[in-house]
Amino acid sequence: MAITVLSNIFTIIPNTPPLTYTAGLYKRTFAGYHNENPSFFATATPATYGSNPATSVQTTIIQEPSSDDGTNFSVQWLGYFKPTTTETYTLFISSDDGSYLWIGANAISGFTTANSTINNGGAHGPVEVSATVSLTAGIYYPIRMQFGEIGGGDVFTFNHSTPTITKTTNVTGKVFYNSITNGL
């Protein structure tokens, strides 16, 4: 943190690391089900990790295909959602099994199942849950999505809509990650 003195007026400027936005979200896949515990992702070792570019028609759907056995794995996506219009957005998660979404400050730290923007937790078949948030065009909003599969079918899909945008999985030009920190 830097402190500048100007005529006995102190201005505190936070020492913020530079952000380098790259299209897509940063994705980590883990062996094991998260058991409705968001801190699972902080202590487990990722089996795979890397970016999910989400930049072409084929990859604009944030969707995790089945693992080899189709059971007992978890996935976390980190990054930023940059709205193209200033509106009320409806965010949707459809999942089988448990999933959560945080957008804004809670996506960075202090995230719990209780303060998630969308809570679609528990072992269940395909269920869609939504939430509405007011977002401003051009602002990078931190976003965190967590999904786990514990048995049966497995699917995770993120959609969004507004009064002027039809419900879509297309996130081209709307999701980014910090390539310096691999996520947020």
Regions found by a protein language model. Give the residues of each.
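Acidic/polar, compositionally biased interaction segments
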Residues: 15-184
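Short, aromatic- and glycine-rich surface loops/edge beta-strands on solvent-exposed regions
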Residues: 1-2, 145
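Interdomain boundary/hinge segments at the C-termini of tandem beta-sandwich modules
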Residues: 5, 10-14
